[in-house]
Curated annotation (Swiss-Prot):
GO biological process annotation, one example: dUMP biosynthetic process
A Pfam family matched in the record: dUTPase
Pathways per UniProt: Pyrimidine metabolism; dUMP biosynthesis; dUMP from dCTP (dUTP route): step 2/2
Organism the protein comes from: Legionella pneumophila (strain Paris)
Entry function: This enzyme is involved in nucleotide metabolism: it produces dUMP, the immediate precursor of thymidine nucleotides and it decreases the intracellular concentration of dUTP so that uracil cannot be incorporated into DNA.
Binding site for substrate: R71, S72, G73, N84, L88, I89, D90, K98
Catalytic reaction equation(s): dUTP + H2O = dUMP + diphosphate + H(+)
Disulfide bonds: none
Gene field: dut
Keyword Repeat carried by entry: no
Stated name of the protein: Deoxyuridine 5'-triphosphate nucleotidohydrolase
Cofactor: Mg(2+)
A GO molecular-function annotation: dUTP diphosphatase activity
C-alpha cells in the first residue's frame, strides 16, 4: 500500500544540506527523521531537549496516523531515546514535527545538524465508540491482569 502525505518544508536546508525523510532500505518500516539545527548541540546526561526537524506533515486521512519512534542503535549504543517514549501525530496536525530527545546515559551526547535521530512510521487508525454495559460477555481470561495469561 502506498499513500501520498503532504509535507511542508519549514527550513531551506531541508532537501539541500539536510535530506528529506527517507526509508533507509526497501524493507524499512520507518522514514528517518533528521535534526534541523544550525550547529552541534550537547545533550547532557539525563537531559531532555526538543529538536526541530524543519518539516511539517498533514496526513489528512482520519484512518491514518503516524508515530515517532526512537532509532534502535541510538538507544542501545548511546542511551538516546525519546523523552515522550512515542510521539503520536494525529491526522489533523499540521505543525512542525519535533523530537523530544532524552539522554538516559551518563555521558554527554552530541547531536549534529542533519543527524538521523528518530523514525516516522505511519499506522492505520480505527476510531471507536463505547457501549456502556453492566456486565461483559464472559471470556476465558475474565479480569485476570498482569501475569495472568502466563509466566511473562
Amino acid at each position: 500500500m502506498h499513500q501520498v502525505i503532504q509535507l511542508k518544508i519549514l527550513d531551506s536546508r531541508i532537501g539541500d544540506t539536510i535530506p528529506l525523510p527517507a526509508y533507509a532500505t526497501d524493507g524499512s518500516a520507518g522514514l528517518d527523521l533528521r535534526v534541523c539545527i544550525s550547529e552541534p548541540m550537547q545533550v547532557a546526561p539525563q537531559q531532555t531537549v526538543l529538536l526541530p526537524t524543519g518539516i511539517a506533515i498533514y496526513i489528512a486521512d482520519p484512518k491514518l496516523a503516524a508515530v515517532i519512534l526512537p532509532r534502535s542503535g541510538l538507544g542501545h549504543k548511546n542511551g538516546i531515546v525519546l523523552g515522550n517514549l512515542v510521539g503520536l501525530i494525529d491526522s489533523d496536525y499540521q505543525g512542525e514535527l519535533k523530537i523530544s530527545c532524552w539522554n538516559r546515559s551518563q555521558e554527554h551526547f552530541t547531536v549534529n545538524p542533519g543527524d538521523r535521530i528518530a523514525q516516522l512510521v505511519f499506522i492505520p487508525v480505527v476510531q471507536t465508540s463505547f457501549e456502556v454495559v453492566n456486565e461483559f460477555t464472559e471470556s476465558s481470561r475474565g479480569e485476570g491482569g498482569f501475569g495472568s495469561s502466563g509466566r511473562y
